[in-house]
A protein has these predicted regions:
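Long, charged alpha-helical interface segments
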Residues: 26-28, 33-115
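Anionic-ligand-binding alpha/beta catalytic cores of soluble enzymes and soluble regulatory domains
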Residues: 1-40
Length: 115
């Protein structure tokens, strides 16, 4: 777990430097997002999409094209982090928008990616 958290902090450093960096394994694709992010169902890495607040607050969150949509919701790192776990894309295009803050975006699958 210590290496995972350290690597997520490395993703944040890359994001601040303007570098699009991701952690990838057979089950997960992880990146840092802010502002607006579009996910295409046909390009999704796995079945599930999780959003974990990386900042104290992620405000004005809009989720469209998901099983559990949200409108103008505020995530906090101490109170609502589990609300963003294991959502699913239901439309061809899913959109994540936020007015402020930063998420760790985790796309995950139950079965490993086959080479």
């Amino acid at each position: 777990l210590d290496h995972v958290l350290g690597n997520i902090q490395s993703l944040m450093l890359a994001k601040k430097a303007g570098v699009d960096c991701r952690i990838l394994d057979a089950y997960n694709r992880i990146r840092i997002i802010d502002g607006e992010t579009i996910l295409k169902k046909k390009e999704q890495y796995g079945t599930y999409v999780s959003l974990i607040p990386l900042t104290t607050e992620v405000a004005g969150v809009e989720l469209t094209g998901f099983k559990y949509p949200l409108t103008n919701y505020t995530f906090t790192s101490t109170g609502s982090a589990s609300l963003g776990v294991s959502n699913e894309i239901t439309e061809n295009i899913a959109e994540i928008c936020m007015k402020s803050g930063t998420f760790v975006l985790i796309e995950s699958r139950d079965e490993p990616l086959k080479a």
